[in-house]
């Protein structure tokens, strides 16, 4: 297996994307990785780009979509890493990338833990995520990255509430069997 990875794909000219991916596929790549290197993309842009690559570039290069694995690699510069990962899944990406707690250069990569929680809540994956909190704590301890109190899902204050309406919603979620959340 050969993966062809393009740097800064989301800010590239579509004609250049078509030319470079087509040539890579002709030369034997059977996987491509679409990178939002600078965290520039929006969910809508992510979907548009992936549809362009899957529906036009791959077939125009003479390949069937199912024969080419499409990866999405996103960054968090605009705070859209998780949203873009979800958009990539909805658009048919075979693989999405993420890191523990979103660790990466600049503002970081798409946080894997938040991506997994959202994919589970969307019904896309059926993984047992009961150990995900322990994983985030272990990652925090090992890589010595701060875990803010308000970090989504796993921060100490993520599900704290001070009003009756919010407290009622939390209790209802727990009754539905979402204690881990």
Positions of PLM-derived features:
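Short glycine/serine/threonine-rich phosphate/pyrophosphate-binding segments
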Residues: 78-83
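C-terminal helical cap(s) of enzyme catalytic domains, especially alpha/beta-barrels
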Residues: 104-132
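Alpha/beta enzyme core
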Residues: 1-70, 86-91
């Amino acid at each position: 297996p050969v993966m062809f990875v393009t740097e800064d794909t989301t800010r590239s000219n579509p004609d250049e994307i078509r030319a470079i991916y087509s040539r890579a596929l002709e030369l034997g790549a059977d996987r491509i990785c679409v990178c939002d290197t600078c965290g520039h993309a929006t969910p809508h842009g992510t979907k548009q780009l992936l549809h362009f690559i899957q529906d036009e570039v791959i077939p125009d290069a003479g390949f069937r979509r199912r024969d080419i694995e499409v990866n999405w690699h996103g960054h968090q510069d605009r705070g859209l890493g998780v949203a873009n990962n979800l958009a990539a899944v909805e658009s048919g990406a075979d693989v999405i990338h993420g890191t523990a707690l979103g660790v990466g250069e600049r503002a970081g990569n798409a946080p894997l833990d938040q991506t997994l929680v959202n994919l589970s809540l969307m019904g896309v994956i059926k993984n047992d995520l009961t150990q995900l909190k322990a994983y985030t704590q272990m990652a925090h301890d090992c890589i010595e990255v701060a875990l803010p109190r308000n970090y989504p899902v796993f921060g100490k204050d993520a599900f704290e509430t001070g009003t009756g309406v919010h407290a009622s919603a939390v209790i209802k979620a727990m009754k539905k069997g979402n204690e881990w959340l």
